């Protein structure tokens, strides 16, 4: 009724020809209050099922809506409406294709849509358009690059929700900028100038410098690109045999293909910008190499902490687990149930292994700042996969 009253009032004030689109969740994908249903799970729908949706969309069309921008889910199953990295691509397409048969109005499908896949669906008449949100935040020029056959230049969205939607699970941070420059919920972790162009405006320097960047991870590579845009001459020194740093491990999981593409994007952009890179080169403060630079920026990241307790030498690090440098067998116990641990545990589940999680807090991923869609998916998927989870336990 509320949606009907809204469109009727809009048409009354703006005219019957004024187009109005509705974001329409086809099915709720909900098992109960605060309980979403993950992909592959058999469940009894607690919210709107397909039979109700078939009737509802006709009712809403008759009320005056001109287009339906469709996805799935509710706030109890928010990972369907805003799919995190763990969700499969085009995850809502089957339900959206079905509901199109029950309306004469254009139907849009949203939810990690792949352009090539969407183009095929549109050409075959299964949907009328694809909905795109987050990719516009990370690279506002992506559609022009796609049309101009410059696809390799598109900076990929990694579906992290670390800036665009993390406000939903924490108190957030005060927005200190003028409202004409930024909206708190429309930012991007990979592209800081998004909706913050005044705060992060790249201004050409009047005093060009030669700058050494120690560390070639994501931070070091982004630093080099920004310095280059400003007119400086950055040079990257990386002690390993490849760029990427810790992100090489973070992107190793099977569901992080977009993260791998991001590393490839950085590599191409550095080469295109002509930025000098030295691999297998370790730099310290007394290294004579640093004397030839006006400035030195340290981007070395962090190393795993080794606890001075008996038996700690038998543990393996996050990097060793994900790269397979050490045999971890079939059962792996995670000391801590944060996002990294839950992601790695899910990866082991996908490999047919048997992870166990021991967490001191009263919930998994209890740290503020993680998006609800990411956290709830991992919690509910690990339960669905019957991963043993021990909360409020210590070792």
Role assignments for model-derived ranges:
Residues 236-273, 345-393:
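Rossmann-like dinucleotide-binding cores of NAD(P)H-dependent redox enzymes
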Residues 64, 104, 125, 231-233, ...:
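Glycine-centered short loops/turns at secondary-structure junctions
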Residues 257, 261-264, 281, 289-295:
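Catalytic cores of nucleotide-enabled group-transfer and carboxylate-activating enzymes in metabolic
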Residues 33-37, 79-83, 246-251, 309-310, ...:
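Short acidic, glycine/proline-rich loop/turn micro-motifs
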Residues 1-214, 218, 222-229, 304, ...:
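Flavin-dependent oxidoreductase catalytic cores
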Residues 205-237, 278-290, 299-309, 314, ...:
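Rossmann-like dinucleotide/flavin-binding elements
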């Amino acid at each position: 009724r509320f949606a009907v009253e809204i469109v009727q009032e809009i048409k009354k004030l703006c005219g019957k020809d004024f187009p109005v689109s509705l974001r329409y969740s086809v099915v709720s994908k909900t098992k109960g209050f605060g309980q979403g249903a993950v992909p592959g799970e058999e469940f009894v729908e607690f919210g709107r099922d397909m039979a109700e949706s078939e009737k509802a969309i006709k009712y809403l069309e008759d009320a005056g809506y001109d287009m339906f921008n469709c996805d799935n889910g509710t706030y109890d199953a928010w990972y369907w409406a805003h799919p995190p990295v763990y969700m499969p691509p085009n995850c809502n397409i089957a339900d959206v294709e079905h509901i199109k048969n029950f309306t004469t109005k254009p139907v849009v499908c949203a939810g990690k849509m792949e352009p090539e896949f969407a183009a095929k669906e549109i050409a075959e008449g299964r949907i009328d358009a694809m909905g795109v949100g987050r990719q516009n935040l990370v690279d506002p020029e992506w559609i022009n690059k796609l049309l101009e056959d410059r696809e390799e230049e598109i900076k990929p969205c990694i579906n992290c929700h670390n800036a665009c939607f993390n406000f939903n699970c924490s108190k957030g941070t005060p927005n200190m900028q003028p409202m004409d420059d930024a909206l708190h919920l429309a930012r991007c972790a990979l592209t800081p100038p998004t909706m913050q162009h005044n705060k992060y405006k790249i201004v050409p320097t009047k005093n060009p410098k030669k700058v050494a960047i120690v560390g070639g991870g994501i931070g070091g590579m982004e630093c080099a690109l920004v310095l280059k845009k400003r007119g400086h001459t950055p040079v990257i020194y990386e002690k390993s045999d490849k760029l990427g740093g810790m992100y090489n491990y973070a992107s190793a999981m099977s569901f992080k293909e977009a993260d791998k593409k991001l590393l490839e994007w950085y590599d191409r952009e550095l080469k295109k910008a002509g930025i000098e890179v030295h691999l297998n080169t370790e730099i310290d403060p007394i290294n004579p190499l640093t004397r030839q630079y006006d400035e030195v920026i340290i981007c070395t990241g962090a190393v795993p902490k080794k606890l001075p307790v008996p038996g700690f030498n038998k543990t393996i690090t996050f990097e060793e687990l994900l790269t397979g440098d050490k045999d971890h067998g079939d059962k792996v116990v995670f000391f801590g149930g944060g996002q990294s641990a839950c992601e790695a545990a899910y990866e082991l589940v996908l490999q047919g292994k048997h992870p166990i999680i021991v967490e001191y807090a009263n919930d998994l991923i209890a740290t503020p700042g993680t998006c609800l869609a990411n956290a709830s998916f991992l919690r509910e998927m690990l339960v669905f996969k019957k991963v043993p989870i021990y909360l409020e336990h210590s070792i």
